[in-house]
A protein has these predicted regions:
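Short, surface-exposed terminal/edge motifs of secreted or surface/virion proteins that either
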Residues: 26-48, 144-153, 208-218, 265-272, ...
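Small/polar beta-strand repeat architecture
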Residues: 1-13, 26-27, 91-244
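Beta-sheet-dominated scaffold domains
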Residues: 10-15, 250, 256, 264, ...
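Short, intrinsically disordered, charge-balanced linker/junction segments flanking boundaries
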Residues: 87-90, 165-168, 406-411
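Trp- and S/T/G-rich repeat-edge/linker motifs of beta-rich repeat architectures
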Residues: 1-8, 37-57, 172-178, 214, ...
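N-terminal assembly/attachment segments of tailed bacteriophage virion structural proteins
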Residues: 1-23, 82-85, 111, 115-125, ...
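Pro/Thr/Ser/Gly-rich low-complexity, intrinsically disordered linker/stalk tracts
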Residues: 48-70, 79-93, 171-195
Length: 411
């Protein structure tokens, strides 16, 4: 299996595993998954940070009674197995005729009909395939050109992308009707999405899309339903889209995949949606299963080094040890709490979990354990290398392992 990692980068790799999929992270490379599909079949691929549930296509709206009101709708698909909500369904499509290799990237699509701030989807591009299947926001619109930004508003730099050759389509991630009647009804239709159990429909009001209904069919009639703006469609995000934003460490906890420590945000924690490891979408207002972003900020720089899943989630940083919790033991966007437990600080050597404690290397080549103490209701530990300092003085531990049987031994 070919990899992008050099020999010098091997000891900077972090890895964590779920079943036959191992996640690999390095601060100079996009996160990847090493997957085993058979004993002699392995693949290493970049992680696509999008919902796995396919989105509806060919979303269209037709008025049952004509009028002079505008109405704009978003349709998403809901997965039948895990209730994951898809990206916004796409409606109008416009052919691409050119794409620049520049910063920012500019797409030419004659008469595209896109407005500033619209979410768009690009597909079927020849040559510059780096854009295919991704979501962008549009800015600096002219009649025939679109300047691309990511969904956070950062310009897309296509300077090092493959040269565009031909083809491609721009698809708008909503559909609008310009002659609907505010007191009558409009019918929204779309093509079915593979794996979907149902579809959620949102309508725009004052610039915000709110929930108006759900159906298992591929058609829905809006008979002047007032949108619920407390339930909005998810906004797709890829926090690791650009150089200097690749994570250095990660793990799993409470059915979320965790990442931390990018070159640009050393103290930041990134949690996927619950049970949807590739999905970092959020809603406004937030929902309990939304993706989470949090920053550890206290006393000094706390570069995130390791995630340790015990009965609680522990985060080891360069400056201390932290407990991550939520209300009623559930970590959500609105309840996440990050509490310091001690201030020893961990090196980059991957910690060992032995039974119900963590063993980690702290600064000065001291080995410490860390476990829950009932009497203080906190995590604490001891320097377990104190009786064998001669093994560590003037030496650097570069790797280690643990054997639980026949004797508990740290090698």
């Amino acid at each position: 299996v070919a990899t992008p990692y050099t020999t010098a980068e091997v000891f900077e790799l972090d890895y964590f595993q779920s079943a036959d999929v191992m996640t690999l992270v390095h601060p100079s490379h996009e996160p990847r998954e090493l997957t085993r599909t058979a004993n002699d079949a392995w693949t290493l691929e970049k992680i696509v940070f999008q919902p796995k549930q396919a989105f509806p296509t060919n979303v269209s709206v037709s008025p049952n009674t004509t009028g002079s009101e505008n109405a704009s709708y978003v349709v998403t698909a809901v997965n039948r197995d895990n209730a994951e909500e898809s990206l916004r369904g796409t409606g109008s499509s416009f052919a691409i005729s050119a794409i620049t290799k520049a910063n920012p990237c500019v797409v030419t699509a004659t008469g595209h009909g896109v407005s500033n701030g619209d979410e768009i989807h690009i597909s079927d591009v020849g040559g510059m395939t780096e854009l295919n299947g991704d979501r962008f926001k549009a800015r600096a619109i002219t009649t025939n050109t679109i300047t691309l930004t990511d969904t956070a508003g950062n310009d897309i730099n296509s300077t090092n992308f493959t040269t565009y050759t031909s083809g491609g389509n721009v698809l708008i991630a909503y559909d609008e009707i310009a002659n609907g009647n505010a007191t009558a009804d409009n019918t929204i239709t779309w093509n079915a999405a593979s794996g979907a159990e149902s579809y959620t429909i949102y309508k725009e009001k004052n610039g915000i899309y709110g929930f108006i209904g759900r159906t298992e069919e591929t058609t829905f009639t809006d008979d002047n339903i007032d949108p619920d703006l407390s339930d909005t469609p998810p906004k797709t995000r890829n926090p690791f889209k650009s150089t200097n934003n690749f994570p250095s460490t990660g793990g799993f906890f409470q059915q979320r995949r965790l990442f931390g420590n990018t070159n640009e945000n050393r103290q930041r924690l990134f949690f996927s949606q619950t049970a949807n490891f590739t999905n970092h979408a959020v809603s406004s207002p937030t929902k309990d299963d939304d993706a989470i972003t949090a920053t550890i900020a206290a006393l000094q720089v706390n570069e995130v080094r390791h995630f340790v899943p015990l009965s609680d989630l522990l985060v080891l940083t360069s400056g201390g040890e932290w407990q991550v919790t939520g209300v009623d033991d559930r970590i959500t966007p609105s309840t996440i709490q990050v509490k310091p437990q001690s201030y020893y600080g961990a090196t980059t050597l991957k910690p060992i979990v032995a039974g119900d404690i963590a063993i980690f290397m702290c600064h000065g080549q001291h080995v410490r354990d860390l476990g829950y103490k009932f009497e203080t209701d906190a995590y604490a530990g001891n320097d377990i290398s104190i009786l064998a300092r001669h093994l560590f003085d003037f030496n650097t531990v570069v790797d280690w392992d643990f054997a639980s049987a026949p004797f508990s031994s740290l090698w």
